[in-house]
């Protein structure tokens, strides 16, 4: 029974298989499956042939470079860099691709070949870093040296000119003062030297007790002594007329900033325009006789009458001349000075009284002008003695 049952089942399976195949063929599915299987088999066979006949990847330029000594040195430096920082994955790709699985040098051999000396047990970084540092030092070495030379050249020239200028400016001033000192005549009095020192001061008020004002007023009172003083001043004026361009030494002094007063009155002389500049230059060292009338001892105030003012001024001048005579200034050579002055001067014969009267008239005119302008605080009288030539002199009255 069992055998018959198995035979029946086998027949039924065969019928079902045939029925399935027939159904698949009728629908076209079976043929499509057969074609796909056949294509897959053919593709597998083709792929197998390609893999067997495939050539290895080779970079010809890299291969030629690595065949040289420098090429192997560079590849060894890169491999040492990757090994120093434990870049294993990158190293696993680098070595097969460059075909450098073997033949690369270690760190010690590289350091010896490059001339890098390392202390035992001390590793500061990869050898590639040390090579770059040495290249930078070689590049910066000449430039820094040139820069140092340039800096020395830049800073050194200014020092030498400064030294030269300082050496030149100091002696340039000394000969000027020495030259002026040598050009002074030996016959100059002590009072004249003090008068020259007084010219550098802005406040030139005259007092009766100072020998400076005594010597300057002595020039106004005695005509004979004026001749000797003017002869000495003329020599200084001629010498200093050539030194007039050196006006830098005169800067800073208020006396030289004031304009030179114009002469208002002359006494019996003729003007010579050619020598006027020299005569004015001779007055540069003479002190201006600026003094307020109220500052003179015994002089009345400005509110007194005009006649009393003139008389008091004349009395003061006589007093000063007497005091200077008592001090012994200008004595001993008065007769010679009188002879020289009288022989060479072209002045009109005027006595001290006539000159005093003219001074009194000038003072009266000046006081009238001051009274009309309501400026009665101070009156400054500048009596300047100068000489336009060797044979003439004049007096200036400046309010």
UniProtKB/Swiss-Prot annotation:
Residues 259-275 have a biased composition (Basic and acidic residues). One of its GO terms (molecular function) is protein homodimerization activity. Coiled coil: none annotated. The modification Phosphotyrosine is found at residue 337. Residues 205-218, 286-302 have a biased composition (Low complexity). Residues 163-172 have a biased composition (Polar residues). Keywords: Cell projection, Chromosomal rearrangement, Cilium biogenesis/degradation, Cytoplasm, Cytoskeleton, Phosphoprotein. GO terms for biological process: cell projection organization; microtubule anchoring; negative regulation of protein kinase activity; positive regulation of cell growth; positive regulation of cell migration; positive regulation of cell population proliferation. One of its GO terms (cellular component) is centrosome. Changing residue 74 to F: Abolishes homodimerization and leads to aggregation. It comes from the Eukaryota. Residues 70-102 form the LisH domain. InterPro entries: FOP_dimerisation-dom_N (IPR018993), LisH (IPR006594). It is found in: Cytoplasm, Cytoskeleton, Microtubule organizing center, Centrosome; Cytoplasm, Cytoskeleton, Microtubule organizing center, Centrosome, Centriole; Cytoplasm, Cytoskeleton, Cilium basal body. The record marks 173-174 as: Breakpoint for translocation to form CEP43-FGFR1 or FGFR1-CEP43 fusion proteins. The modification Phosphoserine is found at residues 152, 156, 160, 202, 301, 326. Ubiquitous. Highly expressed in heart, liver, muscle, kidney, intestine, colon, adrenal gland, prostate, testis, and pancreas. The modification Phosphothreonine is found at residues 143, 170, 234. Residues 245-256 have a biased composition (Acidic residues). Residues 139-218, 232-308, 331-353 are annotated as: Disordered. Residues 175-186 have a biased composition (Basic residues). Belongs to the CEP43 family. Homodimer. Part of a ternary complex that contains CEP350, CEP43 and MAPRE1. Interacts directly with CEP350 and MAPRE1. Interacts with CEP19. Interacts (via N-terminus) with CEP350 (via C-terminus). Required for anchoring microtubules to the centrosomes. Required for ciliation. It is linked to A chromosomal aberration involving CEP43 may be a cause of stem cell myeloproliferative disorder (MPD). Translocation t(6;8)(q27;p11) with FGFR1. MPD is characterized by myeloid hyperplasia, eosinophilia and T-cell or B-cell lymphoblastic lymphoma. In general it progresses to acute myeloid leukemia. The fusion proteins CEP43-FGFR1 or FGFR1-CEP43 may exhibit constitutive kinase activity and be responsible for the transforming activity. This is Centrosomal protein 43. It comes from Homo sapiens.
């Amino acid at each position: 029974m069992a055998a018959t049952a198995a035979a029946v089942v086998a027949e039924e399976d065969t019928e079902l298989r045939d029925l399935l195949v027939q159904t698949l063929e009728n629908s076209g599915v079976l043929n499509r499956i057969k074609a796909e299987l056949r294509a897959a088999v053919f593709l597998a066979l083709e792929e197998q042939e390609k893999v067997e006949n495939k050539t290895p990847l080779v970079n010809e330029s890299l291969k030629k470079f690595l065949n040289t000594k420098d090429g192997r040195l560079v590849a060894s430096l890169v491999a040492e860099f990757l090994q120093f920082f434990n870049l294993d994955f990158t190293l696993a790709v680098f070595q097969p691709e460059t075909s450098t699985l073997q033949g690369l040098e270690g760190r010690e051999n590289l350091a010896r070949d490059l001339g890098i000396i390392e202390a035992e047990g001390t590793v500061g970084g990869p050898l590639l870093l040390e090579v770059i540092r040495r290249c930078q030092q070689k590049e910066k070495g000449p430039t820094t040296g040139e820069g140092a030379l340039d800096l020395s050249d830049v800073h050194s020239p200014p020092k030498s000119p400064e030294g030269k200028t300082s050496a030149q400016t100091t002696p340039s001033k000394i000969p000027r003062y020495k030259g002026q000192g040598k050009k002074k005549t030996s016959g100059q009095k002590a009072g004249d030297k003090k008068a020259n020192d007084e010219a550098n001061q802005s406040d030139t008020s005259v007092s009766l007790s100072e020998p400076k004002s005594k010597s300057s007023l002595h020039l106004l009172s005695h005509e004979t002594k004026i001749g000797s003083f003017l002869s000495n001043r003329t020599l200084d004026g001629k010498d200093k007329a050539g030194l007039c361009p050196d006006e830098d030494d005169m800067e800073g002094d208020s006396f030289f900033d004031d304009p030179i007063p114009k002469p208002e009155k002359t006494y019996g002389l003729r003007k010579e325009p050619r020598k006027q500049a020299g005569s004015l230059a001779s007055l540069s060292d003479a002190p201006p006789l600026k003094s307020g009338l109220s500052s003179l001892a015994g002089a009345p105030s400005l509110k007194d009458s005009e006649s009393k003012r003139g008389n008091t001024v004349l009395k003061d001048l006589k007093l000063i001349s007497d005091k200077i005579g008592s001090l012994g200034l200008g004595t001993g050579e008065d007769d010679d000075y009188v002879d020289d002055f009288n022989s060479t001067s072209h002045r009109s014969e005027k006595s001290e009284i006539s000159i005093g009267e003219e001074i009194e008239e000038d003072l009266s005119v000046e006081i009238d002008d001051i009274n009309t302008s309501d400026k009665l605080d101070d009156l400054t009288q500048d009596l300047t003695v100068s000489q336009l030539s060797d044979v003439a002199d004049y007096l200036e009255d400046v309010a």
